[in-house]
Structures are given as structure tokens and as C-alpha cells.
Amino acid sequence: DYISVKSPIVGIFYTAPAENADPYVSIGDTVKKGQTLCIVEAMKLMNEIASNEDGIISEICVTDGQVVEYGTELFRIRR
């Protein structure tokens, strides 16, 4: 059973809090509800995107630095 984490805003997807920092999550990581998965930058504001369920990251659907639209699937989480 999988759930999708979708972008709530239009912006630029980032996997880490800073350029040389480790990514928030990788495929296979266990995550908890409310845990930060990525950042979507919109109008110079960094918006943390959190998991809406406990589970395991099964897929990262976009690449670092990619522009995402509202509703773009960012992650798939296996429950």
C-alpha cells in the first residue's frame, strides 16, 4: 500500500536544507508523520514539506532543483 506526497505549492524542489548538506531522506529510509522530506522554494521562501504518514520512502519522483507544480508527486511512501 503506497501513499503519495504531493507539492502543495509551485516552486523549486530541494532534497537538502543547503547545497552541500545531506538530503533529508533517501530511498529506503523509514519516516514518521510530520518528518521533513524536502524543501520547495517559492518566492525566496523555503517551505518544508513533511510526510503525512509513517512509512518507508519507496520512490523520489522528482530531481533536486526541479521546478514543481501544485499537485506534483514528490515522493511515494510504502505504509
Regions found by a protein language model. Give the residues of each.
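Structured functional modules or segments
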Residues: 1-79
